[in-house]
């Protein structure tokens, strides 16, 4: 067996995604994923609504996660872990400034039912945060094209946990329930 697996690895992974374009400015969608790998079954569901026009956009989403682990013992039941996240993304453009923000509340039973959510970030970056436990995540991204040569992007994000008073461990341990991150990018075109 491989590391952290119960048996030889075989998997069954299915994904169904549906998008309904109700109008030019409104889209509704859903995605469900079922994955069975080496005695562990993971089910994820996301429902969302996108609303946008020329000046602003909004995306509301709700995510659900269920993780089932089979027991190695015949007479024992496996474990089930559940979680969900409610998330809102908003953004607007005004002259040379583009602002976007996100706010999400998450509540999962443990790391097995963690939720992954995309968060806007800097140029050439993809950010999919992984959230477990109970808490909120909020972030603000500001992008400004000062002139034709200078672009400045800044992102400030915070995660507040309600179920713990320490984050991480070892040399990366934070003695508190809040974790902040700040990223700044400056691009100069010749």
Locations of the language-model features?
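Exposed, low-structure sequence patches enriched in small/polar residues
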Residues: 1-190
């Amino acid at each position: 067996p491989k590391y952290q697996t119960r048996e030889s690895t075989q998997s069954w992974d299915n994904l169904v995604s549906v998008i309904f374009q109700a109008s030019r400015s409104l889209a509704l969608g859903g995605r469900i994923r079922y994955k069975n790998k080496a005695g562990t079954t993971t089910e994820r569901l996301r429902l969302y609504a996108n609303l946008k026009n020329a000046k602003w956009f909004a995306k509301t989403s709700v995510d659900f996660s269920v993780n089932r682990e089979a027991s190695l013992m015949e007479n024992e039941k496996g474990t089930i872990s559940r979680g969900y996240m409610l998330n809102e993304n908003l953004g607007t453009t005004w002259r040379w400034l583009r602002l976007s923000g996100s706010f999400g509340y998450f509540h999962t039973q443990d790391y097995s039912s963690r939720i992954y959510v995309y968060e806007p970030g800097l140029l050439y970056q993809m950010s999919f945060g992984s959230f477990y436990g109970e808490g909120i995540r909020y972030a603000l991204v500001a992008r400004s094209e000062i002139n034709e040569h200078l672009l400045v992007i800044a992102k400030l994000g915070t995660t507040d946990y309600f179920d713990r008073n320490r984050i991480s461990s070892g040399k990366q341990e934070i003695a508190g329930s809040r974790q902040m991150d700040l990223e700044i990018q400056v691009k100069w075109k010749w």
